[in-house]
Amino acid sequence: LVYITVPIALAVCLSSYITYRTHSAAMRHVIEKDIKATSFFVAENINLTISDIKNSFRVAAKSETIKESLENTGQREHERVVAFFEAIKHVMPTITDVFLLDETGNIRARLNSHDYGNNYGDRTYFRQAIAGETAIVGPLVSRVTPKECVYIAVPVGNERHKGVLVASVELDSISVLCFNHDITSSRIDIFLLDNTAHILMAKESTKDSKHPDSIKLDDHTLSDGTPQGYVTYAFNGKTYTGFYKKIKNLNWYVLIAMDDTQNNKTELSSTKNSILLTLLEILIGRLMGSIII
């Protein structure tokens, strides 16, 4: 009996170990693919929203209402352009504010406030747009609210009357695109980072240990412009595995990460099921053999 039982026990142990190693590697591959797919999804969501605003503003820049507001400073023109801004906001609710600047950076009209005291001639997005380029800049702190915004600016007018049409989008609005959809799991952390790995926004799976203001990525830098890649980093005694994806048109990155204890739990759960199935198959085989004998 010993000569029969011991080899069987060894075979079961060896089979279980091989199963564990195989399933661990397979599950890690699945988890990494899921993290990568989620980062692509979130990054593309943000990119499409910003691109839609940019393209819509290029069309809006050709509006006669905008041109008339640059050429005339009357109350009638002002009311018409503000009504035009309200229509834009209705179509694109992600936008926080819309305003029109003249060629010196002064406010001609604004959706949320008159704000005639401020001059925006020193802003990067104004300088780029007044030179004829479409600009996407941010995050910058708004001069109207204390919140950080992304700014999309397009040139408007003609050689005689130049101006810049600007849309601002608060980070809070972008966070909806990052965090409020079904693909996000309660087990993963989602970060919006700048190119120094400074955290702009975060959705963390646990509330007991918040990440610091920036993430130290092991042997990796985002400032070199690499568009995507797997990374590891350590925080609060845990090691995290993640995938980052650069957002088009913005110098930002989406990072989807999961701490390795969560990875191991997922792998172990799947492996346990596989081992139990292997043991069950062996026991059934032995039982059938006994019956036949």
Protein language model regions, located:
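Sensory-module boundary signal marking interfaces of small helical input modules
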Residues: H23, I174, N263-N264
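Extracytoplasmic/periplasmic ligand-binding sensor regions of membrane-associated signaling proteins
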Residues: K89-H181, T232-F235
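Short N-terminal helix-loop-first-beta-strand/juxtamembrane motif that initiates sensory/input modules
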Residues: S51-V59, E86-I107, E133-T134, F179-L200, ...
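Short amphipathic alpha-helical segments
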Residues: E32, K36, F40, K54, ...
